[in-house]
UniProtKB/Swiss-Prot annotation:
The modification N-acetylalanine is found at A2. It comes from Homo sapiens. GO terms for cellular component: mitochondrial inner membrane; mitochondrial intermembrane space; mitochondrial intermembrane space protein transporter complex; mitochondrion; TIM22 mitochondrial import inner membrane insertion complex. GO terms for molecular function: membrane insertase activity; protein homodimerization activity; protein-folding chaperone binding; zinc ion binding. Mitochondrial intermembrane chaperone that participates in the import and insertion of multi-pass transmembrane proteins into the mitochondrial inner membrane. May also be required for the transfer of beta-barrel precursors from the TOM complex to the sorting and assembly machinery (SAM complex) of the outer membrane. Acts as a chaperone-like protein that protects the hydrophobic precursors from aggregation and guide them through the mitochondrial intermembrane space. Disulfide bonds join C28-C52, C32-C48. GO terms for biological process: protein insertion into mitochondrial inner membrane; protein targeting to mitochondrion; sensory perception of sound. This is Mitochondrial import inner membrane translocase subunit Tim9. The lineage of its organism: Eukaryota, Metazoa, Chordata, Craniata, Vertebrata. The keyword Lipid metabolism does not apply.
Length: 89
């Protein structure tokens, strides 16, 4: 049975998600939308926005992978250190 996440943690995670979403939306909008003379979204604005989002997602994925690799290395180092400390001399 999966453990339930406390409501306060769920709220915190949701607030973090909204903050990230808002920052990404603002960044891509400011980078991609330059002309307000029409109600229509121009093809180049759509393309720019898609590239902006893809770049952000790739960056986030890469950071997550590096973070995971770092933690694996730290755990291995701790395990090796614990193994050395546990051995008689």
């Amino acid at each position: 049975m999966a453990a339930q996440i406390p409501e306060s943690d769920q709220i915190k995670q949701f607030k973090e998600f909204l903050g990230t979403y808002n920052k990404l939306t603002e960044t891509c909008f400011l980078d991609c939308v330059k002309d307000f003379t029409t109600r229509e979204v121009k093809p180049e604005e759509t393309t720019c926005s898609e590239h902006c989002l893809q770049k952000y997602l790739k960056m986030t994925q890469r950071i997550s992978m590096r973070f995971q690799e770092y933690h694996i290395q730290q755990n291995e180092a701790l395990a090796a250190k614990a193994g050395l400390l546990g051995q008689p001399r």
